[in-house]
């Protein structure tokens, strides 16, 4: 009888010892690192010049608009240029309207005025927080001859958390474009 008890105890210990305990793995986070931006001066026949990230691909349009592509980030900056012809109020209103169309999905829109008196460049930078289609836009003008607006769009469903590293990188490029912009 003692042998049977010892045998049953050994079988029970063997069965309990053979169970593989599953340990849950922690959630992994995708780390997106982008190289430090290097900038080159961009100039063509259009009446505006600015610094451009050397990793970006720029395409000029006949109306002096530009698309700046970031293939690795699946994003594009769209720049449109318009001459001012007694229509500065309409141009400003349209640029502001474009930004505030995102208020439905945006958590917050931060306005940051921009003034460069030395080069006659005045404008507004908008940082759009939340799951809006764009997370940054700006416009600049000299109020008499030139008007330029700029926005970035990603080729993905808006999800601020997932595009935040790329959005932050491109937002810095947009600020550089705005701050280095000169009228010809």
Name what the model sees in each region.
Residues 77-85, 137-138, 160-168:
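Second-shell loop/turn segments in exported
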Residues 26-46:
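Post-signal peptide N-terminal segment of mature Sec-exported envelope proteins
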Residues 151-184:
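Surface-exposed amphipathic alpha-helical segments
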Residues 19-25:
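Bacterial lipoprotein signal-peptidase II cleavage site
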Residues 1-5:
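Positively charged n-region of N-terminal signal peptides that target proteins for export
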Residues 45-97:
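Secretory pathway targeting signatures of secreted, lumenal, and periplasmic proteins
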Residues 14-17:
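C-terminal motif of bacterial Sec signal peptides marking the signal peptidase cleavage site
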Residues 96-151:
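Signature of long, low-cysteine stretches enriched in small and polar/charged residues
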């Amino acid at each position: 009888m003692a042998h049977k008890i010892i045998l049953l105890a050994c079988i029970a210990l063997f069965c309990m010892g053979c169970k593989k305990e599953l340990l849950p793995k922690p959630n992994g986070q995708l780390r997106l690192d982008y190289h430090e931006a290097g900038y080159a001066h961009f100039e063509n026949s259009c009446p505006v010049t600015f610094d451009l990230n050397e990793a970006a691909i720029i395409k000029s349009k006949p109306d002096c608009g530009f698309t700046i592509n970031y293939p690795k980030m699946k994003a594009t900056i769209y720049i449109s240029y318009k001459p001012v012809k007694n229509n500065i109020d309409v141009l400003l209103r349209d640029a502001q309207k474009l930004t505030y169309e995102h208020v439905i999905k945006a958590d917050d829109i931060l306005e940051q005025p921009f003034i460069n008196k030395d080069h006659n460049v005045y404008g507004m930078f908008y940082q759009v927080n939340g799951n809006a289609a764009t997370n940054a836009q700006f416009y600049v003008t000299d109020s008499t001859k030139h008007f330029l607006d700029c926005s970035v769009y990603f080729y993905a469903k808006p999800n601020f958390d997932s595009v935040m590293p790329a959005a932050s990188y491109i937002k810095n490029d947009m600020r550089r474009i705005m701050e280095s912009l000169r009228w010809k």
